[in-house]
A protein has these predicted regions:
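Short, amphipathic alpha-helical "recognition" segments used to contact nucleic acids or chromatin
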Residues: 33-49, 94-108, 240-248
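Short, conserved catalytic/metal-binding motifs centered on acidic residues
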Residues: 40, 101, 205, 242-243, ...
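Short Lys/Arg-enriched helix C-cap and helix-to-coil transition segments
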Residues: 77-90, 133-160, 292-299
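Dynamic "connector" segments at or just before major functional cores
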Residues: 11-19, 24-32, 37, 147-340, ...
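An anionic, glycine-rich sequence signature occurring as long contiguous blocks
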Residues: 15, 174-181, 405, 409-503, ...
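Short alpha-helical "recognition helix" segments of helix-turn-helix
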Residues: 52-58, 113-115
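Short coil turns linking two alpha-helices in DNA-binding domains
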Residues: 61-64, 121, 276-280
Length: 712
């Protein structure tokens, strides 16, 4: 019963009827879906049943019944008939037509000429000249299913061509050079055991970062130079994905393309080959000339914040020094990892609580981390809005109690190590705490928790905050942490501070695999000539005065000062001593007259800085790729017991693994070869199931990606 006196009956074939007080009022059979929909419409329109009850009985959403009623009111019963999908006429690519196309292509005709001579489109020509397989058999294949319901291709009836070469795109290159093509569309090269095709595993996670969408929003689709559209074979999509895939196979620099097979990378892009190094650099220079790299970074950050709100309540801020080995007059910075001051540029990086990259910019010369925190506050506030109260975590380089007070007033919490640590806490003040981190590990801390007041402005003011001290029982060392967070569990705060190593791991991994220190461009820009720098003449004069003072002190220690002041002292010795004292006075006076700082133009008139516009674009692409890899590593964890230690190494192996590519209807099947060990193969197979659930479309097409591993 679906209402008072109203009954719904339908058999397994789909035929049914609706009875009103025992009378069969509406009926339909399984071959007439229009009559079935009409019955649903009329039983609601006559008021004998509620729309919700009818929807439940017919097994559809209530909105669907409402839509049927609207369609019936507008177009009558004809509007209720289902629209027939699929081909409207027989395919033009008969076996005879395919043979004719291949004959003309073999004779040297271009794709456009073959299309004109045979009366089909250029797309049909490309399909026809692909690897020869009987069309009827290919269309007759039926997909099997995975355990979760996703489709996975069966063993092909006709084997794919091993190491198949992509279709040559010479006609499109000629069209691009003639100004007739905005961007070459991707054409998938089907085949088996294609090298590096495992890199396509990154696409679902890369789509979540919004990289391609952000690049299109900032720079526009296709190719633009000075705001004007230009023709191109390699569009923005191809350029960005080229950098992504080269990073995944451990060649993050542009010159690394010379060490990769251009055809293998071209297959990943849906093209016949990847751009050459010269072309890639030239096109990246065009993008850099737009001076919109910071906009790209902010667009990616907005997507990251929206997609992962659980990761953006805590931010880690740190600087990274990139050593410079060129011949330009670049300023020096201290490179901590080699304990040496040398020409270098300093970047400020912001990561989320899991260590994934969020923002990066070039630091001002000589700027401290405390100074960079002021820029960080503005950028994060722009991302999170005025009501959020995030936590900024940094090391002792950002120490400034005055700045801490300003940050708190601006709606931020701070978390840092205490500089100039005070007296140690007594052993009785420490309490044992346990904390379960995001990886499920139990952390044990001995912590002392109390409120302190930190002086600043020459002890005229005090900054009140919370101090959490960790005791290492083995060594007796105490680590003092300052924060304005009021979490009831001090172990949570301590763990957040100690998790700052994630930033160091980020730097280390990016240096090793993503070209963090890559120069990317040789262009330089003039340094600020009015910027005040240390005066080397002042330093030299002070050193001379110190040398004179040391000489006098050495003589006094050798002979005794009294020996120079005795009445019977050697006259020549006394005169020498007096002369040395006079020389010391002269040198001190000279040092005082020399200014401590002078404009940069006085000291180093040729000083320059590295132009980082192109590098910032490359960094944005690399950072998004790293974040996508991090997402895959997290998805891999339930499927691989050693994921905590080996997830990224397993992913790098998978990225370089050969795979089959096959188009089946509207799906693109990616079947990876087995990996180096059965457990690693099973782990990647589990990852494939996770990725299939995302329903990701290959960029630039309407093909749904379906991943699997052979033999699983």
């Amino acid at each position: 019963m679906i209402g008072d006196g109203v009954a719904f009956a339908e058999d397994v074939t789909g035929s049914g009827a609706i009875f009103v007080w025992g009378q069969a009022t509406w009926s339909w059979d399984d071959s007439d879906p229009g009559a079935r929909r009409l019955a649903a419409v009329q039983v609601v329109s006559t008021g004998v049943c509620r729309q919700r009850d009818v929807a439940d009985a017919f097994g559809v959403n209530e909105t669907t019944v409402w839509r049927w009623r609207e369609e019936y009111a507008d177009g009558g019963i004809g509007a209720l008939l289902p629209i027939r999908h699929g081909p409207k006429r027989p395919t033009k690519l008969t076996e005879a037509k395919v043979a004719e196309i291949r004959t003309l292509r073999t004779a040297g005709k271009t794709i456009a000429e073959v299309a004109a001579m045979t009366g089909v489109s250029t797309f049909s020509v490309r399909r026809a000249i692909g690897p020869a397989r009987p069309v009827t058999q290919r269309d007759a294949r039926t997909p099997s299913t995975l355990s979760d319901g996703g489709e996975v291709p069966p063993v092909p009836l006709v084997p794919l061509v091993p190491l198949a070469k992509p279709i040559e795109r010479n006609a499109e290159r000629a069209a691009a050079s003639s100004g007739l093509l905005d961007e070459a569309a991707p054409v998938i090269c089907e085949g088996s055991s294609l090298p590096l095709v495992g890199s396509l595993l990154i696409l679902p996670a890369l789509a979540a970062t919004g990289l391609l969408d952000a690049a299109a929003v900032v720079f526009g689709a296709g190719r633009k130079v000075g705001g004007l559209h230009r023709s191109a074979f390699y569009g923005l999509r191809s350029l960005v994905l080229c950098v992504v895939f080269s990073c995944l196979v451990s060649e993050p620099r542009a010159e690394g393309m010379t060490r990769l097979d251009p055809i293998a990378i071209g297959r990943l892009l849906g093209l016949d080959r990847a751009p050459e190094v010269k072309r890639l650099r030239f096109r990246m220079a065009e993008l850099a000339s737009e001076h919109r790299a910071d906009e790209l970074g902010m667009e990616l950050a907005r997507t990251h914040v929206a997609a992962r709100p659980e990761a953006v309540g805590l931010f880690y801020i740190d600087g990274h020094v990139r050593a410079y080995h060129g011949g330009a007059e670049v300023g020096k910075a201290h490179v901590a990892r080699i304990r040496l001051a040398m020409p270098a540029e300093v970047d400020t990086w912001v990561t989320d609580r899991f260590g994934d990259g969020l923002l990066v910019w070039q630091s001002a010369p000589g700027a401290s981390l405390a100074g960079e925190l002021k820029l960080t506050v503005d950028k994060i506030r722009t991302l999170l809005g005025p009501d959020a109260r995030p936590t900024l975590c940094f090391d002792r380089g950002g120490w400034s109690p005055k700045l801490f007070a300003q940050l708190v007033l601006s709606g931020f919490d701070i978390l840092t190590y205490r500089k100039y640590a005070k007296h140690a806490e007594p052993r009785s003040a420490f309490v044992d705490h346990e904390f379960i981190d995001d990886l499920g590990h139990t952390q044990h801390y001995l912590l002392a928790d109390r409120t302190v007041r930190v002086p600043y402005d020459s002890n005229r003011r005090r900054f009140t905050c919370r101090q959490i001290v960790r005791l290492d029982e083995a060594s007796g060392h105490q680590t003092q942490i300052l924060t304005t967070r009021d979490d009831p569990d001090p172990a949570l705060v301590a763990h957040a501070m100690f998790s700052r190593w994630r930033v160091e791991n980020f730097f280390r991994y990016m240096r090793a695999h993503y070209g963090l220190d890559a120069l990317d461009a040789y262009e330089t820009v003039p340094d600020d000539p009015d910027r005040l720098v240390v005066n080397p003449a002042k330093r030299k004069a002070v050193r001379h005065a110190i040398e004179a003072a040391h000489s006098i002190a050495s003589s006094e220690a050798d002979r005794g000062r009294a020996s120079f002041e005795r009445l019977d002292a050697n006259e020549a010795l006394v005169d020498a001593y007096a002369g040395a004292q006079a020389e010391l006075g002269v040198r001190k006076a000279a040092a005082k007259t020399i200014p401590a700082k002078v404009p940069l133009s006085v000291v180093r008139p040729d000083a320059v800085r590295i132009d980082v516009e192109r590098k910032r674009i490359m960094d944005a692409i690399r950072m998004a790729t790293y974040n996508a890899e991090s997402s895959l590593a997290r998805l891999l964890a339930p499927h691989y017991a050693r994921a905590e230690d080996e997830a990224r190494s397993l992913l790098r192996e998978a990225f370089k693994t050969p795979a089959d590519l096959e188009i089946r209807g509207s799906t693109l099947h990616v079947r990876l070869d087995p990996l180096s060990a059965p457990r690693r193969t099973r782990a990647i197979a589990g990852l494939c199931e996770e990725l299939n659930a995302t329903k990701t479309i290959y960029p630039g097409t309407d093909l749904l990606l379906v991943y699997s591993v052979k033999g699983t």
